Amino acid sequence: MAGVLAAGTGIEVVGVVPEGTNSHTFEPPPSVARELAEADLVVVNGLGLEDPIIEMAQANMKDGAVLCEVGTAVILRSEWVFDFSFPQEGGRPNPHAWTNPPSVLSYVTVMRDA
């Protein structure tokens, strides 16, 4: 993937969660299935945070496509952090790893290797 990015060809990034929408509660419409079916790589946090998108991806992705759950790959269950908006009883962490530079570096490494 890094080589393709460096060459400047072949990459189209499509976000499926509309701007201003809570990605944790987003229920993807059927049109998202079409986007997922065309993808070579689908990147999500994982960690139980986008289950409807993950389920739709698994049901619609083409053969050879990769589902990359970056948070699941980087953050161990023993490292999960819970807070008022993501209580432990709910079973889903509040990683916000994208605001932590070492975590972001790990995320990028996982995506590169996917």
Annotate each predicted stretch with a short phrase.
Residues M1-A114:
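Extracytoplasmic metal-acquisition and chelation regions
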